[in-house]
Regions:
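Boundary/entry segment of secreted carbohydrate-active catalytic domains
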Residues: 1-21
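Carbohydrate-binding surfaces of carbohydrate-active enzymes
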Residues: 2, 10, 28-31, 39, ...
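Short, solvent-exposed turn/loop segments enriched in Gly/Ser/Thr/Pro and often Arg
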Residues: 6-11, 41-48, 87-94, 152-162, ...
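Short, polar loop/linker segments at the starts of domains and inter-domain junctions
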Residues: 17-25, 358-360
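Aromatic-lined carbohydrate-binding/catalytic grooves of carbohydrate-active enzymes
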Residues: 33-68, 91-118, 160, 167-170, ...
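Active-site cleft segment of glycoside hydrolase catalytic domains centered on the general acid/base Glu
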Residues: 125-128, 159-188
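An active-site-proximal structural segment forming one wall of the substrate-binding cleft
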Residues: 31, 35, 123-158, 201, ...
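Active-site-adjacent "subsite" loops/lids of carbohydrate-active enzymes
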Residues: 85, 89-146, 184, 195-197
Length: 361
């Protein structure tokens, strides 16, 4: 896994026009070189549900008229930059409106993340619904048609759900559809099925391609869940809600798992999607150095403008940190922790925990 990565978010509403109109291969390559970047995660599908390439398994964004993903991959590969591909797994707002019966439901029938359709926000999809097969076809398509260096599936985790699909399946399995323990037991089954089907979808065309399921946190004490990933990406933006103590503790846990991992921060002053926000260069230098000091590779989150033009101020900022990391890489790879003090994780001892229950920790 490469040291100097960027996670290039591109969640773009169908109400925005002229998508990708200012994309320019040379400008894209210049930004990557300026940022000292050697891997960039690019979008096949965003939280709004749109594809950024011609698609039979999905629908291309209504205001995009060319293969943006393909153009980005070609530009990156020309200069030796790897291109993992991102698909939003747990969120698909287009299908949330077309198939509300595919949504995760709470006990009171409300949805999550947004509680209903009168509240602005995304609505989480249930992997026990036909949505899973819809997602699998999208993964197969992108693995078949594009030279991906990995697959990143977002908003994935064990999710208790009271939708009618889940209730019916629990009854078929002889479980109590409303008992909290049985609901969680079933949620584990649903996640396992999702993980196995998505892995099979990748392997159908790209056997052994790196695959990561992101839930915003690596659950401590659940090594079985780690095994569904080829590597780990520790999403942890200090100013974005995770805090400055989250990453070191999470990285310390990952040091004992025997898998490659990276620390994912962001260029934002606050959190994801903040086009006009830039953290101080010294803050990013610190976060990149912190990742390296904890045995991790690094990824910096950015949000591409709907126009497709890379923001050079952002890549100057990233370059100020990654140029320093690049000088040290030969001493940072294949390292082992020399810590001789164990850390007890409260999370590993509080019992069952799901992505829908994170606030209990």
């Amino acid at each position: 896994m490469r040291f100097r990565q960027v996670h290039l978010d591109f969640h773009t509403s169908e109400h925005i026009e002229d998508i990708g109109k200012k994309f320019d291969k040379k400008q894209f390559q210049t930004a990557l070189k300026t940022g000292h970047i050697n891997s960039i995660t690019l979008f096949s599908k965003c939280h709004h549900g749109w594809a950024y390439h011609p698609s039979k398994a999905n629908e291309i964004h209504p205001h995009l008229d060319f293969d943006l993903l393909g153009a980005q991959i070609q530009a990156a590969h020309e200069i030796g930059v790897k291109t993992p591909i991102y698909l939003s797994a747990g969120l698909d707002e287009k299908m949330a409106h077309r198939h509300p019966e595919w949504l995760v439901r709470n006990l009171d029938e409300s949805t999550t993340w947004a509680k209903d359709f009168t509240e602005p926000g995304y609505h989480k999809m249930c992997m026990s619904s036909p949505y899973l097969d819809y997602l699998v076809k999208q993964i197969e398509e992108v693995c078949k048609n594009y030279d991906a260096d990995g697959i990143f599936l977002d908003i994935a985790g064990v999710q208790p759900c009271y939708c009618q699909n889940c209730i019916a399946e629990r009854e078929e399995l002889g479980l109590n559809p409303y008992d909290e323990n049985d609901v969680l037991k079933h949620a584990e089954t649903v996640y396992k099925r999702y993980a196995e089907k998505t892995r099979a979808a990748v392997d159908k065309y790209k056997p052994n391609l790196p695959l990561f399921h992101n839930g915003g946190h690596i659950r401590q004490g659940r090594r079985d869940l780690v095994n569904y990933n080829t590597h780990l990406e520790l999403e942890s933006l200090p100013t974005g809600g995770w805090g400055y103590d989250h990453f070191p503790f999470s990285a310390r846990y990952c040091q004992g798992l025997g898998v490659d991992y990276l620390g994912m921060t962001g260029k934002f002053h606050g959190s994801w999607g903040e086009f006009g926000g830039f953290k101080h260069p010294n803050a990013l230098r610190f976060e990149v150095a912190l990742a390296a000091a904890n045995g991790a590779k690094c990824s910096v989150g950015d949000q591409l403008s709907p126009s497709g033009e890379m923001d050079m101020v952002t890549y100057d900022l990233i370059g100020s940190a990654y140029s320093e990391l690049e000088e040290k890489e030969e001493w940072l790879d294949n390292v082992e922790s020399v810590a001789d003090i164990a850390i007890i994780s409260p999370e590993a001892y509080v019992g069952d925990l799901s992505t829908g229950q994170m606030t209990k920790v």
